[in-house]
């Protein structure tokens, strides 16, 4: 896509997703067995033929770098790149202080590539979006800035930027994370919220970033500072995400913020529904990632009974013997011994589960080893003495943990 530069904000610490983010940045957290969270933003860009992309990182980014090197390397293709960019303190000895500051500290990339438009997207949501449709809207409106937005219950909107628009799609109000979100006129209980995805006219973006960087009282954030300053000037528009159409799909648009353990678990359960609202199987919108060279998953009966796999996803290299797996996602190289009963659980890969284990609503991080006969998620009071248990009763086993030994 000529004249367009993509910049993906991938520096999120992800504190609400701990312990899954203890050793990795939030965009590097595995999802859906085969993917990382960053993959969904990257696929939205690549499937829209937007192939000049900088991925701005900051915290604990090594696993993200490794994933991108293996799965997203387009070196050698003229004028196409997907480059991770670590925080380099180009404008002083300081980390990124906000989302706008992250772009400002890398403004040289905008200046050197000289695009007409800059797409700035987040990297920690699960959704599909044909960015070309949002860009067409942005160009048609001749906007300085276009913000993508969706409707959600007002009771859930206080963690987002809440938007007001006129009949032409122009932004006429914006409040970042309000305690009492305003509802859409005529739609009681429903608010219009920012998805954290922006398309800027490049010259306007650079102008606003330079101005904001000089303000000592600014938090240097798009939602808190840039958007509230720009929209009263009258050239900020709002793109309705519900109008976005993905080839090969007839369902309503799907968007999920996976910033908490509960929402992360729920998004996985969405994948396993009979009529899943988010499909991994659309050939017209392929979901690229790094897939290691592994043999197919193997299922075998044992002396303890037949293997049963019900409403589940199982990735390559996995070996399951005589156990029952229901409504669960098993990542690469999951090794499940016989007589186990695993339900509504997520194994992130290279996990060993010994004979006769019971797992209920458990997230097991990579490399964990669970001893035979262990029960997790059955007695939450006991689990809380040893592991992180969310308010909703989801148990999280940390990366590399040896359980029950």
From Swiss-Prot:
EC identifiers of the protein: 2.7.7.27
GO terms assigned for molecular function: ATP binding; glucose-1-phosphate adenylyltransferase activity
Reactions performed catalytically: alpha-D-glucose 1-phosphate + ATP + H(+) = ADP-alpha-D-glucose + diphosphate
Record pathway: Glycan biosynthesis; glycogen biosynthesis
Keywords: ATP-binding, Carbohydrate metabolism, Glycogen biosynthesis, Glycogen metabolism, Nucleotide-binding, Nucleotidyltransferase, Transferase
Top-level enzyme category: transferase
Positions annotated to bind alpha-D-glucose 1-phosphate: 96, 161, 176-177, 194
One Gene Ontology biological process: glycogen biosynthetic process
Descriptive protein name: Glucose-1-phosphate adenylyltransferase
Organism name: Aliivibrio fischeri (strain ATCC 700601 / ES114) (Vibrio fischeri)
């Amino acid at each position: 896509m000529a004249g367009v530069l993509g910049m993906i904000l991938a520096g999120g610490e992800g504190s609400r997703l701990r312990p899954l983010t203890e050793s990795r940045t939030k965009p590097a957290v595995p999802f859906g067995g085969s993917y990382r969270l960053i993959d969904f933003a990257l696929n939205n860009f690549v499937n829209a033929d937007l192939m000049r992309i900088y991925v701005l990182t900051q915290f604990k980014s090594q696993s993200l770098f490794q994933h991108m090197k293996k799965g997203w390397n387009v070196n050698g293709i003229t004028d196409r790149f997907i480059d991770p960019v670590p925080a380099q303190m180009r404008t002083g000895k300081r980390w990124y202080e906000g989302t706008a500051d992250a772009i400002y500290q890398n403004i040289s990339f905008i200046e050197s590539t000289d695009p007409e438009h800059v797409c700035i997207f987040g990297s920690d949501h699960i959704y599909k979006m044909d960015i070309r449709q949002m860009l067409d809207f942005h160009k048609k409106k001749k906007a300085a800035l276009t913000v993508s937005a969706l409707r959600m219950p007002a009771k859930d909107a206080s963690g987002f930027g809440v938007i007001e628009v006129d009949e032409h799609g122009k932004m006429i109000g914006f409040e970042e994370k309000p305690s009492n979100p305003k509802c859409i006129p005529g739609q009681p209980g429903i608010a219009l919220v920012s998805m954290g995805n922006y398309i800027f006219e490049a010259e306007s973006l650079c102008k606003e970033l330079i101005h904001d960087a000089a303000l000592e009282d600014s938090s240097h954030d798009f939602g808190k500072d840039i958007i509230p300053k720009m929209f009263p000037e009258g050239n900020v528009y709002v793109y309705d995400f519900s109008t976005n159409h993905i080839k090969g799909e007839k369902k309503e648009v799907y968007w999920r913020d996976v910033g908490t353990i509960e929402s992360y678990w729920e998004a996985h359960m969405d994948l396993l529904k009979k009529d899943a609202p988010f499909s991994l199987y659309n050939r017209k919108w392929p979901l690229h990632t790094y897939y290691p060279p592994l043999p197919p998953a193997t299922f075998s009966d044992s002396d303890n009974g037949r293997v049963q796999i019900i409403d589940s996803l199982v990735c390559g290299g996995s070996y399951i013997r005589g156990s029952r797996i229901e409504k669960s996602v098993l990542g690469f190289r999951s090794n499940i011994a016989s007589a186990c009963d695993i339900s509504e659980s997520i194994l992130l890969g290279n996990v060993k589960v010994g004979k006769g284990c019971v797992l209920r609503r458990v997230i097991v991080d990579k490399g964990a080893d669970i001893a035979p006969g262990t029960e997790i998620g059955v007695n939450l009071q006991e689990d809380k003495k040893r592991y992180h248990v969310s308010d909703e009763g989801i148990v999280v086993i940390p990366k590399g943990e040896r359980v029950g030994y």
